[in-house]
Amino acid sequence: MTLMISTSVLDAENASRRDALTRDYESLGDRLARRGIDIDAVKAKVAAYGVAVPSWGVGTGGTRFARFPGPGEPRNIFDKLEDCAVIQQLTRATPAVSLHIPWDKVSDLGALKEKGSALGLSFDAMNSNTFSDAPGQAHSYKFGSLSHTDSATRRQAIEHNLECVEIGKALGSKALTVWVGDGSNFPGQSNFTRAFERYLDSMKAVYAALPDDWRIFTEHKMFEPAFYSTVVQDWGTNYLIAQELGPKAFCLVDLGHHAPNVNIEMIVARLIQFKKLGGFHFNDSKYGDDDLDTGSIDPYRLFLVFNELVDAETRAANGFDPAHMLDQSHNVTDPIESLMTSAMEVGRAYAQALIVDRKALAGYQEENDALMASETLKTAFRTDVEPILATARLENDGAIAPVAAYRASGYRARVAAERPAVAGGGGGIV
Amino acid sequence: MTLMISTSVLDAENASRRDALTRDYESLGDRLARRGIDIDAVKAKVAAYGVAVPSWGVGTGGTRFARFPGPGEPRNIFDKLEDCAVIQQLTRATPAVSLHIPWDKVSDLGALKEKGSALGLSFDAMNSNTFSDAPGQAHSYKFGSLSHTDSATRRQAIEHNLECVEIGKALGSKALTVWVGDGSNFPGQSNFTRAFERYLDSMKAVYAALPDDWRIFTEHKMFEPAFYSTVVQDWGTNYLIAQELGPKAFCLVDLGHHAPNVNIEMIVARLIQFKKLGGFHFNDSKYGDDDLDTGSIDPYRLFLVFNELVDAETRAANGFDPAHMLDQSHNVTDPIESLMTSAMEVGRAYAQALIVDRKALAGYQEENDALMASETLKTAFRTDVEPILATARLENDGAIAPVAAYRASGYRARVAAERPAVAGGGGGIV
Amino acid sequence: MTLMISTSVLDAENASRRDALTRDYESLGDRLARRGIDIDAVKAKVAAYGVAVPSWGVGTGGTRFARFPGPGEPRNIFDKLEDCAVIQQLTRATPAVSLHIPWDKVSDLGALKEKGSALGLSFDAMNSNTFSDAPGQAHSYKFGSLSHTDSATRRQAIEHNLECVEIGKALGSKALTVWVGDGSNFPGQSNFTRAFERYLDSMKAVYAALPDDWRIFTEHKMFEPAFYSTVVQDWGTNYLIAQELGPKAFCLVDLGHHAPNVNIEMIVARLIQFKKLGGFHFNDSKYGDDDLDTGSIDPYRLFLVFNELVDAETRAANGFDPAHMLDQSHNVTDPIESLMTSAMEVGRAYAQALIVDRKALAGYQEENDALMASETLKTAFRTDVEPILATARLENDGAIAPVAAYRASGYRARVAAERPAVAGGGGGIV
Amino acid sequence: MTLMISTSVLDAENASRRDALTRDYESLGDRLARRGIDIDAVKAKVAAYGVAVPSWGVGTGGTRFARFPGPGEPRNIFDKLEDCAVIQQLTRATPAVSLHIPWDKVSDLGALKEKGSALGLSFDAMNSNTFSDAPGQAHSYKFGSLSHTDSATRRQAIEHNLECVEIGKALGSKALTVWVGDGSNFPGQSNFTRAFERYLDSMKAVYAALPDDWRIFTEHKMFEPAFYSTVVQDWGTNYLIAQELGPKAFCLVDLGHHAPNVNIEMIVARLIQFKKLGGFHFNDSKYGDDDLDTGSIDPYRLFLVFNELVDAETRAANGFDPAHMLDQSHNVTDPIESLMTSAMEVGRAYAQALIVDRKALAGYQEENDALMASETLKTAFRTDVEPILATARLENDGAIAPVAAYRASGYRARVAAERPAVAGGGGGIV
């Protein structure tokens, strides 16, 4: 297997931190044992956990106002896979990559699959794109795609999704994620009902072509790029879609796609209860679909989402098998650093949720002891589980401190020298 | 039939406005005719339209900080019915009253029904109350009602709903509206899934006892009185309830119960499309469940909701038969004046939606002519339909200018003399 | 003066609508007279009113996901001025254009000024751009501009603003509008206090170079492009800036730059009261800085803003002289049509505010007659003032129905033939 | 000094936890030492820190829908002081109580002061109440108080504030907190400018009577009890007030009084920078002014607020001396437990902010290393500082685990037996 970061750098980095980590792990183990928790069992679960990385995440993102690229931007999916391999090597938490078509389209799928294998990466859910026009495309998506009033445009969008499935089959993917920007900017522009009927008809055509062992994930979003109405605007509509399509259809929850103040963990619980939670696009946000680094704004909210997931896992909820993926826009950081940190944040929330005293919690809930129920969650959240995460990484040949190891490796400077600088772009779209 | 306002006052008031109204109606008819619209047909529809008044709406509302009562507060449901009769006499748009149990509980239901008949009022949906404790109640709803962890408390809440149905049957009502405040104030306080399972079980027990010709309306609300999670928090959960319960179960939409920025008219469209729109609690809001007078904050939003309703009515959407009710808190106005004005605002939105050029709109939607689609709605909304509403009222023996007629009648001073002043209350709940 | 639309087309269009307009104007005059309002006086004020058009508004806008250009996109500021001239010719409500530097930078300012004169357009406030990197720029604005931690970058941003002033002086502009995207995406990324100190220092350098008869407008915005904190995030900070800078500094209010639910008309009132209202960027929004067409989402809110403006105008508030400009992103419409319609919407809100019965309103406010105060505003808002606007346009040689006249003229097809199609862009910025 | 909880109970509770605490404190000290932090120095600061408790907080709160009292509700301010003394005895973090007039009005101020002394409690800021009508009050606050259109009503509100100052002087308080509910429920109901002028005039009269060594805190709030506009709606208006009044006037920040998504820590920074931060009402919220327990919903936000406070403290910001108070509504918990837990949460955020590596942070900020700046804060936040807080309590004769000690003491059952049960109330205010 090709390793992007030299093991000598990594070993030296780990060596400098190993003793302190051992002490911290022991001390934490002692404290957890007092609470009846076996630290090694938690570590084993954390070590087995992974979150997929989006191929587009390793490039610098931007806004409609501007994009400010960083050095060494990946030029194509092969470069992107190498960056993803760095993330996986150091964190040991991101074994799969999620592709975006047509951005990651290649002529030789076999070469792509081989590259992934060589880097130890598999291919997660495929993502279609009918929210922008590819060069030379016959019909524009300016006024919609799967819900467009014109049947030829809808057909084109359906075909594109089918092509994504075909590519995914070649790469070993088992799921298709469909997010559309379809909607309207003016009251009256679109007939809500007819648009949704058209969307459902199109999705049924896609669904019909889905292999038996695949799942299809639909993703809701409140607004942007449409600013008055969006066809798949919330989890209610998303649930209706999954219900209309059938047993292979599930709802994808992106943490930044909801109205202000919405209780997202409750939506997660409802979708689990009705067997339609497909998975997540993890990120964080303060205002809208900010696509900030996971856990950087409201880490307790992330924990509360994982509290629902571990609750479902613990009681072996029927049909519970969500896919986990990061989906962020890295506008001001090195994308590799952001994705490593975010993957660790997801793992941290998982670890914290694992050490919730669920028996005590259930008792407090039954007795309506609101304060102690809250404290039970807070106690788990307050626990600094970093020694667990770091030990899991170390034992899996990753880094105790991935960002430090990455910086020590000089990887960014190396690829900056190899990959030519790209223009900024975005500045004329206001 | 007993008339609360003397016809001589009403006639005098109308006489002073009749000529101007005739001219305005003619001039508007001329303008509408140019757009291919028959003003008399619109007037006929408006004249036939009614919205129910909530019995509690004729008392002065308040907040957790204070309640500032006005003069002549109704002392009981009989007083309330008289106030409601004033509203109906002058607006001719509020033929039914919606009761709230136990607030409107009486020992003699026959007398109550008779009083309604004498005043020309029928009884709309019954409203149960399991969000506050009635004196002497065996089990408290402090920690929930239909979803409470304790089965005896749930049973009590179920029985209360069944009692509401019994009362409603005696009065000629055909629907039960269920809104619960159940939820939690702390993460962890409640297990979302188990609480919803308990809620559904309780509601199934209520549903099972529903007469064949009744409907049951469940009402979602984002927050308040619970401030972290609410069991029936949004239309997605509300839809699941209606689906789980069966064909007599429908979703009620209160305009003030959504997250900030949410597109409510789209939710209305979805519920119509999936045959689960039960009806409305009309009001307006700027921040939360402000319960302000309908149309006082965002009249265009109200129009857009009615645009969906008329769209469904026009295409005779399957299963479309929503109930219309006002639900407001009148903290700084004479409740009778607010309810009259709000009933007229609802009628206004309906009239404006009726004169939308739907054929042109459909064409613009098909061609993605967003600007002209928007202008088609705006043109209807901009039309001052007051002459239509006023003429419909006049021809139905109501008032051209209900507030002016009401003030001229001296009704408030009269009841202030008859009904003793009540204390303010509310001041200690912070 | 060069006319972009042939007068024969315009005359024919107007001829077909003139009789109906005359009747409608008379009928409206009759109704207004009954309320003690002289329709001709209102018309005169409306006719004298103008709103500036942003040069960038005549191009198609987009989002970070995609931009879908329309036919005949303007290639440069000369093309843009021609499009602006169409808007002014037909609406007679947009006599000035606001430029954006460097987007509208030219080598020959004299030619630009002459072109404006020939088209009957003057130059409104200059807009600087330090939120994106121009090709070849020495220092990047990736991490801020006027508040950047690096003094050379701040100096560059200051110089750019000074250059904008110089260009504006040559063109007859009298104001500089400064909006920066400076902020942060992570808690901790920026020290709020130091960043604001640096911003103020930079702005003081710009202010020092401002000609005596110029004003400087600073614009606040809650978020985007920065997603955790923004240096000039709200009107409170904006007020502090204007206060720190001095008497030529004022606050600019963009209707889409506030937190959800915020009462914008109240902010307008506060800024007027404290003599710091500089002007407006008009648009509409439902979720964030959606930059939708003015009045398309919440026309009553627009009216309430104008209600404050007319209130201040009526009482001749000290220091009250706001600048009016549209600032919208036209993603799915012909930008010329959107700007014409929006200019008319602004005029409509002004006309509606002019016919508010201010004496009655003051009385109701004094007596706390909330309902009648509200009805006083609603009565004005409900009045269809289109005949006033259309007559004002007609008498100023504009179009009774600008969009219809524009479509009849074939202008878009003509420029589409002359101006080569442009690429979409935007698709890689997610 | 009177101790409400017997020392034998407390000692037994502490004894059972002391060994584990010693180990945890040592282990944490070891980890902090590695980061260059002296745990004892942090502990000393935490031990010296206190937050005031609101007298009304020890009673059960409610909503406009209902209030569900708990057992042993305090009957008067003497009972309330005893409950507050429990909180202080166990947490050693709440040495002062903030009174609310007229709720806490007594005939014998000397007795009240003595009772406080006996319990080891001092008196923090006085709170006036002009948002509800006291029995027998001459003028109603239904339509406002300090901003009312009627001068006699304003005068009454001024006098009430002056009385609060007089009471406070007798008790040793040094500050007056003014929060008014003044505002409007309808567009047009209130003239924003005139209402604010009247408010300022009234406040100037209050300010004029303020003793030299007192401060006056004004508190802004977006909405509730007024639902369209609020006179002191945000920090911008609050700043204007403090500026207009003079050097003894400061702004109070309640964490739940802002628009959705607003960056509160930034407002705190601005007020510090402009020397007008008066202090805090701590609580937490998810939707509006939910008045939930501090740190229960978004603990990271609380930490970010304290990060600003410690930043200001570290650089000895000019004029920086904020008052700290809890302000919560305990609807579903034992108020004593909630207040103890919340006081500890405030201390926790303070301790976490104290261990931020500020030198490293400043370096990352200077270099725009957004990721490491964020990680620097997250590292401090992730540290479980409970051993520091618990040791500080223990060394101050408080409880290692205050809630457990309180439950063991049987205090609630004791007062429930002494204090008669109270009615629920609130149920009629909808």
From Swiss-Prot, chains A, B, C, D:
Record keywords: Isomerase, Manganese, Metal-binding
GO MF terms, alphabetically ordered: isomerase activity; metal ion binding
Pfam families per the UniProt record, alphabetical: AP_endonuc_2
Binding residue positions for Mn(2+): H257, D289, D291
EC code(s) of this entry: 5.3.1.-
This protein's record includes keyword Protease: no
SUPFAM superfamilies documented for this protein: Xylose isomerase-like
Residues in the signal sequence: none
Cofactor(s) needed by this chain: Mn(2+)
Class of the enzyme per the UniProt entry, highest EC level: isomerase
Domain of life the protein comes from: Bacteria
PANTHER family: L-RHAMNOSE ISOMERASE (PTHR30268:SF0)
Record family assignment: Belongs to the rhamnose isomerase family.
Protein name according to UniProt: Probable sugar isomerase R00627
Species of provenance: Rhizobium meliloti (strain 1021) (Ensifer meliloti)
